[in-house]
């Protein structure tokens, strides 16, 4: 019986050595004794229980190693955080960050102010046109030539007589040209007109100072020659059917208008024909003015007569406006009004028309016009 137990114990011992050796245990003398004692219980159950116990011991022995690895990982993370903190601390100072932020804010505002797409298209087209215009500029040598020419012109202008003198010359030319248009002798008019045209062209060309002085003296001589020519009407008067008419540019009452005409050897207009009426009515309505004529009923209410004492002919009554004369509020003086005549108060200030006979010119007759004024003086203040 004892012989059979011994081989079995040896087998158990070998098996335990293999299993325990696989989990990292060394055989000891005590261990062998423990195996021998356990041989008295259910051998398989005891062997499994011990195997589980050995596995637990192995796992427990590995826990410190895992903890050590976790600690190493934490240390690595901490080191990385430390390095990041150092890197952040080395960033630009706060003022630099603020500057960048402000710049970004300005850029954002600028982008917000960009024009809408249609406006951008318009700007683009304008830039294209400008680019084309720049491309058409003359070459540098041409620009230099233009600049030199401008410099010469500027120097020439600096040598011109004062502006008031130029203005005086220009006004003289304008007056002479207008006067020539009223001259009776066509051949003489043509000659003087050509002279004036040439002189005007010369003045417009503005030659050197000595030439201007020569032209100015010639103008004075021409003016004197023109004034010696026979003219039917004075300056600023209008010729019509053998008479001269002056249309005033200021206003007076009816009585002062008579005086103004007498001062220049004329009278407040007296109308003698339908043609004359149409001519004067046209002059008045064209300027849209209320204008005195030499007609009133001051001597006898309702009896109209001219300033030369002649009565108003019945055929002329057709020229009164509808419902006129109505003598509302002592309206005793006649005026041109709209397309006809009207009676109004004689103390009102209105424009007026003077009339006198035109001068007679025959053959080569020349006479010096009267030096007395031919234009009525303005009314006293």
UniProtKB/Swiss-Prot annotation:
Extent of the Sequence repeats: 96-118, 119-141, 142-164, 165-187, 188-210, 211-234
Glycosylation sites (chain numbering): 80
All ranges on the Extracellular side of the membrane: 59-381
Gene Ontology CC terms, in alphabetical order: membrane
Keywords: Adaptive immunity, Calcium, Cell adhesion, Disulfide bond, Endocytosis, Glycoprotein, Immunity, Innate immunity, Lectin, Mannose-binding, Membrane, Metal-binding, Receptor, Repeat, Signal-anchor, Transmembrane, Transmembrane helix
Ranges for domain C-type lectin: 240-355
Domain notes: The tandem repeat domain, also called neck domain, mediates oligomerization.
Full protein name: CD209 antigen
């Amino acid at each position: 019986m004892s012989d059979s137990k011994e081989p079995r114990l040896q087998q158990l011992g070998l098996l335990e050595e293999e299993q325990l050796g696989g989990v990292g245990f060394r055989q000891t003398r005590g261990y062998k004794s423990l195996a021998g004692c356990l041989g008295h219980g259910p051998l398989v159950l005891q062997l499994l229980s011990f195997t589980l116990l050995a596995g637990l011991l192995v796992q427990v022995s590995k826990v410190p190693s895992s903890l050590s690895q976790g600690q190493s990982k934490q240390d690595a993370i901490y080191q990385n955080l430390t390095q990041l903190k150092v890197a952040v601390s080395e960033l630009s100072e706060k003022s630099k960050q603020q500057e960048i932020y402000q710049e970004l804010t300005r850029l954002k505002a600028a982008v917000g102010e960009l024009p809408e797409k249609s406006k951008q298209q318009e700007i683009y087209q304008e830039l294209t046109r400008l680019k084309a215009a720049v491309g058409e500029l003359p070459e540098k040598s041409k620009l230099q030539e233009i600049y030199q020419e401008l410099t010469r012109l500027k120097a020439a202008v600096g040598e011109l007589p004062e502006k008031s003198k130029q203005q005086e010359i220009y006004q003289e030319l304008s007056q002479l040209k207008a006067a020539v248009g009223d001259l009776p002798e066509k051949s003489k008019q043509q000659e003087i007109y050509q002279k004036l045209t040439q002189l005007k062209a010369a003045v417009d060309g503005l030659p050197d100072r000595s030439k201007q002085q020569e032209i100015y003296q010639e103008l004075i001589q021409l003016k004197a020659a023109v004034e010696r020519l026979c003219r039917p009407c004075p300056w600023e008067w209008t010729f019509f059917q053998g008479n001269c008419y002056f249309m005033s540019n200021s206003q007076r009452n009816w009585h002062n208008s008579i005086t103004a005409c007498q001062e220049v050897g004329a009278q407040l207009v007296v109308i003698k024909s339908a043609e004359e009426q149409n001519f004067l009515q046209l002059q008045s309505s064209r300027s849209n003015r209320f204008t005195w004529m030499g007609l009133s009923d001051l001597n006898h209410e309702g009896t109209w007569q001219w300033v030369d004492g002649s009565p108003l002919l019945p055929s002329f009554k057709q020229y009164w406006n509808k419902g006129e004369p109505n003598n509302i509020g002592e309206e005793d003086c006649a005026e041109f009004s709209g397309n006809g005549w009207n009676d109004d108060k004689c103390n009102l200030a209105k424009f007026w028309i003077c009339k006198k006979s035109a001068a007679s010119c025959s053959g080569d007759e020349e006479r010096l016009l009267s030096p007395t004024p031919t234009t009525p003086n303005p009314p006293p203040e």
